[in-house]
Regions:
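An exposed, glycine/acidic-rich loop-and-rim segment of catalytic or binding clefts
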Residues: 1-165
Length: 165
């Protein structure tokens, strides 16, 4: 047996600028993981009424200011194994839109809090569809073990458009 949770850690900045603060992010998730000081999940919380609530498209600048940066796993609603919306990242100034569809149960939203040279903090962000972090140590977070003879597959679609299309 082996633990498996493949994720794509590509970074996105739809404006090609020095900051994602003017981007908008929509994450249609009601819940996210809660972490301790070592970024180990300790539970699940609702996002309603918090800066982490992006069920309505929100400008990232105020969110980054309120949170100090995002590095959070959202629990995506919907039926496991079926494609569903994970996120929409957009840049109003250019009209560029990235839609993420996935069959994964979670999505880590990371705002580049620790980017180093030649990049800098919050210059881009990653939208990582995946299984739950630390699931091997916390079975309540869902399955993550692939046993001999089993098959693992996951699908994430990245759809690029411009506003109005």
């Amino acid at each position: 047996p082996t633990v498996i949770s493949m994720a794509n850690h590509a970074y996105w900045n739809l404006a090609g600028s020095d900051s994602i603060a003017d981007h908008e992010l929509h994450v249609p998730a009601v819940r996210k993981l809660v972490y301790d000081e070592f970024q180990i999940p300790t539970g699940i919380t609702d996002v309603e009424g918090t800066p982490y609530d992006m069920r309505v498209s929100s400008t990232l600048g105020p969110i980054l200011e309120a949170t100090g940066g995002l590095d959070d796993c959202y629990l995506l609603d919907g039926v496991g194994g079926q494609l569903r919306p994970g996120a929409v990242l957009s840049h109003p100034g250019t009209g560029r839109v990235l839609r993420v569809l996935t069959d994964a149960p979670g999505m880590q939203v990371y705002s580049g809090n620790n980017l180093g040279s030649p990049f800098h903090v919050h210059q881009s962000m990653s939208l990582e569809t995946q299984r739950m972090p630390d699931a091997p140590n916390q079975p309540a977070l869902g399955p993550c073990v692939l046993r001999p003879g089993e098959h693992y597959a996951t699908t994430t679609l990245l759809d690029f458009t411009t506003s109005g299309t």
